């Protein structure tokens, strides 16, 4: 199907040659929203097309403006509510109407949790044909002030000769000017309030790529630049970070590095008295409170005993592996990136953990042949990326594990992998959502499988 522009809108030419009715960008349409989709958008049906409307709730009568269309699918943004859902609330953030960072602030937190629970249950039923024997209560932290890392968009506007600083608009490369964000942790909110002014004051702002903010055992500002920073601009950034009590990191063509080579970043796992080192670019859960609850629940569900060996797949920096090692006889932890394996090993030694072994392996391939596979395990923990762990779970039963905890950031791939595990004789004993990203439709979940 080819796509053509016409009169500021979109025109589609089906392969058969019959021209589809034009749906111009910007067109407004009155709609009745039937339900909410998995990505948090309202769904409506009219004239043979499916409309996805961001900002709309089930049962509402709304007016929506077209953002784009393709075939029988139209993407739109809420413009006006004629008949509101009783669940609707005024979004707490003043930037919500334009910023693309959050998409569920118009729904109270209890409603967000119910939506995510429903989406997980629907995926498990539709794809795997199962429901858990028991639903666990959602794991929740604060609905605002939770995010400990953020990427700030920066772009030099050649025509206006000004620096745009903020977050991306929904479904757009436009930058919404923002100097406050209520989902950030308080230390990052304080930095964000002054960051745009500082960046715009630089003598060569066009050298900037983007900026990342981090909060853990210390705060950090990472400035990515496409050309060398003038000395005066570097001095200005250093002064800003000193005043904010934050580290300054820079990244040009190489890896990120602190301006002060002695500085380090880390995050605490307080219940276990641990501190894990990490660097900008490493994966780390953005929600510290829910991360702690998640680890505690995973350990409770796996219940590793002092004589047991546990396998941790997609181990990252050791977020699960190190607490697991406090309870199990031995933990074998596997990660796909060698640099992460080395940092996880360093984290283990830095926390006096010596019963965890770390290996690099391509976990997009079947496990057969790896040196650690033949050793056998009592329990397995998986924390894969959005693609899931399809190749890994194909042979998971051969490891001999009686208990398996699967931490998922994508209900669709969790459901797909659940079907495989059930086919190998595992029961879906328990499942529940992890509210890692309040105010968004992003669903994280944990599932416990037991053999037999």
Curated annotation (Swiss-Prot):
Binding-site residues, [4Fe-4S] cluster: 93, 99, 102, 181
Active site: 409 (nucleophile)
Catalytic class of the enzyme: transferase
GO terms for MF: 4 iron, 4 sulfur cluster binding; iron ion binding; RNA binding; rRNA (uridine-C5-)-methyltransferase activity
The UniProt record lists the keyword S-adenosyl-L-methionine: yes
Catalytic activity entry: uridine(1939) in 23S rRNA + S-adenosyl-L-methionine = 5-methyluridine(1939) in 23S rRNA + S-adenosyl-L-homocysteine + H(+)
One record GO biological process: rRNA base methylation
Stated family: Belongs to the class I-like SAM-binding methyltransferase superfamily. RNA M5U methyltransferase family. RlmD subfamily.
Function: Catalyzes the formation of 5-methyl-uridine at position 1939 (m5U1939) in 23S rRNA.
Protein known as: 23S rRNA (uracil(1939)-C(5))-methyltransferase RlmD
Organism: Pseudomonas entomophila (strain L48)
Encoding gene per record: rlmD
């Amino acid at each position: 199907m080819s796509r053509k522009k016409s009169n500021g809108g979109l025109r589609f030419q089906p392969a058969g040659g019959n021209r589809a009715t034009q749906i111009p960008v910007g067109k407004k349409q009155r709609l009745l929203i039937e339900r909410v989709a998995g990505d948090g958008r309202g769904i409506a049906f009219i004239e043979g097309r499916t409309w996805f409307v961001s900002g709309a709730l089930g049962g509402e009568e709304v007016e929506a403006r077209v953002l784009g269309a393709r075939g029988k699918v139209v993407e739109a943004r809420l413009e006006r509510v004629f008949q509101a859902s009783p669940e609707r609330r005024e979004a707490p953030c003043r930037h919500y109407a334009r910023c693309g960072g959050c998409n569920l602030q118009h729904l109270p937190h209890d409603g967000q949790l119910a939506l995510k629970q429903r989406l997980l249950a629907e995926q498990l039923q539709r794809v795997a044909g199962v429901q858990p024997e028991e639903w666990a209560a959602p794991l929740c932290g604060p609905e605002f002030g939770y995010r400990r890392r953020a990427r700030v968009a920066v772009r030099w506007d050649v025509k206006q000769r000004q620096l745009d600083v903020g977050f991306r608009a929904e479904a757009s490369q436009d930058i919404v000017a923002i100097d406050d964000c209520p989902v950030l942790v308080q230390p990052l909110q304080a930095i964000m309030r002054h960051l745009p002014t500082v960046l715009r004051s630089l003598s060569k702002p066009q050298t900037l790529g983007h900026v990342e903010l981090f909060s853990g055992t210390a705060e950090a500002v990472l400035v990515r630049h496409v050309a060398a920073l003038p000395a005066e601009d570097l001095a200005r950034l250093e002064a800003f970070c000193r005043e904010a009590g934050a580290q300054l990191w820079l990244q040009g063509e190489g890896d990120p590095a602190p301006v002060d080579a002695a500085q380090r970043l880390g995050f605490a796992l307080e219940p276990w008295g641990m501190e894990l080192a990490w660097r900008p670019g490493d994966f780390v859960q953005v929600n510290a409170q829910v991360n702690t609850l998640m680890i505690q629940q995973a350990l409770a569900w796996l219940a590793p005993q002092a004589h047991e060996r546990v396998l941790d797949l997609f181990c990252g920096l050791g977020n699960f592996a190190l607490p697991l090692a406090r309870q199990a006889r031995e933990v074998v932890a596997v990660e796909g990136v060698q640099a992460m394996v080395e940092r996880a090993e360093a984290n283990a030694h830095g926390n006096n953990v010596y019963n965890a072994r770390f290996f690099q392996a391509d976990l997009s391939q079947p496990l057969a042949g790896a040196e650690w596979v033949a050793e056998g395990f009592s329990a397995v923990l998986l924390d894969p990326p959005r693609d899931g762990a399809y190749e890994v779970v194909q042979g998971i039963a051969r490891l001999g594990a009686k208990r398996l905890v699967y931490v998922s950031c994508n209900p669709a791939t969790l459901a797909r992998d659940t079907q495989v595990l059930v086919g190998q004789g595992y029961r879906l004993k328990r499942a529940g959502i992890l509210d890692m990203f309040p105010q968004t439709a992003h669903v994280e979940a944990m599932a416990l499988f037991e053999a037999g």
